[in-house]
């Protein structure tokens, strides 16, 4: 069966700049934005340009750990 736009259920709340196409049946964009539909454990926010989703309330140590360069081996640190 070919993929049709709007057949996949949304996994995040609709926010400003989102299209109403593909919403789950019975869910309006205003209902999704009112906060009651949002998960209390993880909230998603859009950047000002509505280009990306951001997970709020994530400790900075998570981002710091994700951005660390891979550990160098002892041979690379002390070449002969």
UniProtKB/Swiss-Prot annotation:
Pfam families: UPF0731. It comes from the Eukaryota. Residues 1-44 are annotated as: Disordered. InterPro entries: FAM229 (IPR028025). Transmembrane segments: none annotated. Belongs to the FAM229 family. This is Protein FAM229B.
């Amino acid at each position: 069966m070919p993929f049709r736009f709007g057949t996949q259920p949304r996994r995040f709340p609709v926010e400003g700049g989102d299209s109403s196409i593909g919403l789950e049946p019975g869910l309006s964009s205003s209902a999704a934005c009112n906060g009651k539909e949002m998960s209390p454990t993880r909230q998603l926010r859009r950047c000002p340009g509505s280009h990306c989703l951001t997970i709020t309330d994530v400790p900075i140590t998570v981002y710091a750990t994700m951005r660390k360069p891979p550990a160098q081996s002892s041979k690379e640190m002390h070449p002969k």
